[in-house]
Amino acid sequence: MASDDDEVPQTFFFSTSGTGNGVWEINRPQTAITKLVEQGIFHGEVLDIGCGIGDNAIYIGKHTNNVSITATDLVPKPIEVAREKAQKANVNIRFEVVDMIADLSATNLKQNSYDVILDAAVFHVFSNKDRLIYIKNLEFLIKPNGLYIQLCFSEKETREGGPRRIKKSDLYELFSSQNGWTIESIEDAIYESTSAGPLGLDGRAYLSLIRRHKSV
């Protein structure tokens, strides 16, 4: 198990993502995300960060009316795969290669433009330093009163292997009211992986719904 401040090196994703060998490439959307779709959570301008091969974004696009979806990943290869899958599914998604801990002003992502931001297994790959940069970029991207959805491995997952675990106490500190956020809910969930993954098919996770304040 990664320690509290461990990050997953970017080189790992460049060598693995989009090849079919990533344990997160299950070729279907995460069940936790499909349930949110059924609840009507996604609307307006949606940004899927770390979209990988696109299964969550494509599912949202196919099963949600009147949404405009942008999906990003650090690595070009899974974006290529995701574009092909979206075309075959006849779902219109804008795909971008973006490093979410870099300067976003040089990208096509627009400030305060997104009603809903989805993060399925991104936050838990960052070091403490990098996740502060990441949160600043979330604040740059999200609309006032926008919703940030995070699905990441939780402290309740005690099996060895995989990225760092996210502590509920850290979420409340990082996404505090003083920082311009309100945590609406943190629920136990499952992050599904392939059987080749160190945590098997059912990594214990938190599904967090976090609201940006209307005025910050």
Per-range role (PLM):
Residues 1-47, 53-109, 126-140, 146-216:
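Class I (Rossmann-like) S-adenosyl-L-methionine-dependent methyltransferase catalytic domain
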Residues 121-125:
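Short catalytic micro-motifs in class I SAM-dependent methyltransferases
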